Amino acid sequence: MGIVKSIARLDQRTRRRLWLPLLTATIVLVYPFQTTVVPAWHIRVIDDTGLAVAGMKVTEHWQHNSLESIGHEDFQTTDRDGRVSFPARPIRSSLFARGLAPLLKTLKEGNRALLGRYASVVVWGNRNYETGVAIYKPGEVPIGEIVISRAK
């Protein structure tokens, strides 16, 4: 309440000069800006001989660990060319939340706190093939091809 009292003590002319910058700063701090957790991910699943594998289940997992407490997933099946495409995964969050959420998470979880973006895909669902995994590294182009081996 000290700030409110200080502002109330200012003369009317000074208050008129301050209201627009204060309003602008408040809007900038609380406006939910969009960030991409993981860009669109286009994957081709092939076997160890280089042939496309149709009918494989592919699950994409993603989460912005700094801003979300739970992750998300989406499931698709490869087409006859062994391809699946997942759209970009955006999240909206204010600058205030982006500053406060990681701090609170670190205070709560200590050095075990996971921060930042995470995404991966898992290729599975056919007994003839082993499971395949690819992990997205923020700032890089997602892996476009996953090679799975025949089960032995």
Residue ranges: model-predicted function:
Residues 16-40, 44-51, 59, 64, ...:
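Beta-strand-rich domain onsets/edges
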